[in-house]
Amino acid sequence: MIRALAVVALLICCRPGVCAAPSALLYMTESPESVHSFLAHADKIDLLVPTWYHVDENGLVTGAPNPLVMATAKQHGVPVMPILALFHKKHFHDLSLNPAAQERMNEAMVREAKLHGYTGFQFDFENVDWIDRDGLTAVVKRSAQALHQAGFQLTIATVPNAPGYPTGDGFSKWIFTDWRGAYDLAELAKAVDLICLMTYDQQTRWTTPGPVAGWQWTIENLDYALAVVPKEKLSLGIPLYGYHWFTGAPNVDKVTGVESPNPSANYISAPDAQLLATTYKAPIQWDATDRTAWFFFYRDQMREWIFFTDLRTFRERYQLTQDRGLQGFCSWVLGNEDPAIWDFLPKKH
């Protein structure tokens, strides 16, 4: 009887999405810290997405792989799918209206994938105007068709956009029109092999202090995406970094000499955040509502705030991908992570 119950418990535990390890997609830049992190932990990564390529408004693709990274990926059996990035609003608009430029872009992606053994490419098109929503969808569909016909995959990173419209004027309107409004998740999901939902940068240098990816905000954006994207095609963004808010020196108008406030914020890695906490003897606290690590300290008699991803913050969002049965998680960016995360993640190769 005991053995039978154990077997039943094992079967329940191992239903897909309950105890299966989510697919681990990690982004990598060309910074030494990022490359070193991949070289040290390649055996725990399912898919490497490096920031090697860019495209301009004429469809000209520029970039090249890192040979050491490619050799290490091959040694460990890690598939490589580089980003193809474009962050310029007008340049993307021009590209979306130019079929010949899109054809050049698609031909270049197929050429590079064949030449270097990539599994495909990931589009990272940001700062796209909301009026180019249909244009973005059309570009993605054409590129997906071209890559699929050649035997390669196309994925896309999308800015989280719940509830799908601005909830007010000011910041809400700006972030919708300039960042969130261009992604038609339902249509994009029909074309691509995977959507990486960038559920991070809730608070940034543009905002007051707060979590990089608060729990309720993450849930709202995940639920919004899951309403139109199959869970097997959705990867949850988990940030590996944080932000550091502080008071900057006043801005001074060069003409009038008038001073204005300068609240400032910088991007910060988890190890650097932990170093500041140690340096200023600041206890790292846990925000039970937003389920994230944070702390504050005083320097020059002024309070400074840091919200960042430690192991607990990461682990709770990793568990969320399991609970929802998602394809996996996607984390920006290697080299910024709490080192303890690697003891938690399972070996894949």
Predicted segment positions?
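Sec-dependent N-terminal signal peptides
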Residues: 4-13
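Glycan-recognition patch characteristic of GH18 chitinases/ENGases
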Residues: 21-109
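A cross-domain feature marking catalytic cores of carbohydrate-active enzymes
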Residues: 28, 52, 82-86, 125-127, ...
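Short, acidic/polar
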Residues: 28-42, 98-114, 176-188, 309-322
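Conserved, mostly hydrophobic/aromatic
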Residues: 48, 123, 195, 236, ...
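Substrate-binding surface in catalytic domains of secreted glycosidases
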Residues: 57-60, 129-275
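The substrate-binding groove and active-site-proximal loops of carbohydrate-active enzymes
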Residues: 93-99, 125-133, 206-213, 304-307
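Glycan-binding loop/region signatures in secreted carbohydrate-active enzymes
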Residues: 240-319, 341, 349
